[in-house]
């Protein structure tokens, strides 16, 4: 099908919700904080031995996740509202949930609490 140059979604993450480890293989993703509590954004490259955590908040409102990097997120409060912009446009053909891989294929050092 058609591939858009960029696509943006609004994403509301409630207090007890977790955006589980996933990867957009075909495009970079920009996360922009819009409101609520700060959001913990976790990233894990296949080249890394451990996951990194970055706070996305009013003080640090924009962050970038390169194509091919695993990401997960959770709110630090009652809720977090962010926008996620993917370029080139999002396609489920380029999207993968880590839980769909065999455990032996998980990246070394991945934070398993976010599977």
Language model feature labels by segment:
Residues 14-17, 24-46:
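Glycine- and acidic-residue-biased ligand/ion/polar-headgroup-sensing regions
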Residues 46-58, 97-104:
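Cytosolic-biased juxtamembrane loops and peripheral soluble domains of multi-pass membrane proteins
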Residues 19-24, 54, 73-75:
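Short histidine-centered beta-strand/loop micro-motifs
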Residues 6-8, 18, 27-30, 79:
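Short, surface-exposed beta-edge/turn micro-motifs
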Residues 1-4:
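Short, small-residue-biased leader/transition segments that mark boundaries at the very start
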Residues 57-76:
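Conserved metal-binding segment of the jelly-roll/cupin
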Residues 74-115:
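Double-stranded beta-helix
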């Amino acid at each position: 099908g058609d591939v858009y140059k960029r696509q943006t979604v609004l994403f509301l993450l409630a207090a007890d919700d977790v955006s589980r480890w996933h990867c957009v293989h075909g495009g970079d993703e920009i996360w922009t904080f819009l409101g609520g509590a700060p959001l913990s954004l976790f990233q894990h490259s296949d080249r890394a031995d451990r996951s990194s955590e970055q706070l996305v908040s009013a003080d640090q409102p924009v962050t970038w996740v390169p194509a091919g990097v695993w990401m997960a997120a959770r709110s630090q409060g009652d809720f977090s509202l962010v926008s996620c912009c993917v370029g080139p446009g999002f396609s489920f053909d380029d999207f993968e949930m880590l839980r769909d891989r065999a455990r032996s294929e998980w990246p070394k050092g991945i934070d398993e609490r976010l599977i």
